[in-house]
Amino acid sequence: MPKKKQHSLPEVTASAENRLFVDSNHPNHTAKDITFKRCMFVRVGLKNATLVKLIFHRCVFEDCYLRGVKFQNVDFTGSTFKECNLERTRMDSCGFRYARFSKCLLNYDEILHSLPTEPNLAIGLLKSLRCNAIEMGNKDIADRLLSRQIDIEQQDLRKQIWGPTEYYKEHYKGVDRLLSLLKLVRLRISGLFWGHGLRIMRLFISAVLLIVLFASLYQFFGTFTKANEIVQNNFPMSLYLSTVTFTTLGHPAYSPNTTFTYILCAFESILGVVYLGFLVAALYRKLSR
């Protein structure tokens, strides 16, 4: 494969395609109304530069120093950034459709101001930014990006279900709307029970509420036996039985006496196992910080 000829950035005044820009430094450089297609920028420095109405279509930036650059109406559709420094950048009306970031120092707030309007593209960009934040050890930013991603997913799912525009009415019908409803319910339950893994305290609170709920059901509708004798169900006893059932510890001296009580115990035990999985996952996320 022939080696690409290296070019200098200032020499481009209108457009460039399939060009290689490498090992060049242009601080305070100003460029306007230029289109770059499938170009590669390697170790290019543009500190405090001003770029206005530029198009970077499917370009690759590797180890570039773009700190303090002011981007105005710059389109990065399909571009990839690897190990670049984009701290303190300012981005006004920029486009990041299908853009990807890996191991970059970023000004996340500026990029979030330029999220694509299409939900699927916005979610894709947020996933890439979140992976970048995890790679760089920015766990708090990664959690914030996850929350933003889930909010957009829920908004899009609601549109798929209710079809507020002709686009959604044409593309989501019958089974598709039902599947979207199930996805939305799953996200809502995940957020309610444990905040999508971001809020451990909510997990404990919801577990306590479930234990109390099942204790109330045992008190009014369930019956247990001990040594072949029916146990008088008061709330403290029901709360104890609910706790040992939810935590899957069990108690060898007590056993359900009716089919309905058996079903309640089995269902609560399943919920306890599910909650244990949630707890392990949430603690792992917390300790991995």
What annotation goes with each model-predicted range?
Residues 156-208:
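Cytosolic-side membrane-insertion boundary helix
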Residues 230-289:
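Pore domain of cation channels
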Residues 204, 208, 212, 271-278:
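Residue-level signal for the membrane-embedded core of alpha-helical transmembrane segments
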Residues 125, 177, 192, 196-200, ...:
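Hydrophobic, aromatic-rich alpha-helical transmembrane segments
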Residues 1-146, 153, 162:
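Tandem repeat scaffolds
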Residues 205-238, 260:
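Outer-pore turret/helix-boundary of cation channels
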Residues 187, 216-219, 253:
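An amphipathic alpha-helical interaction surface
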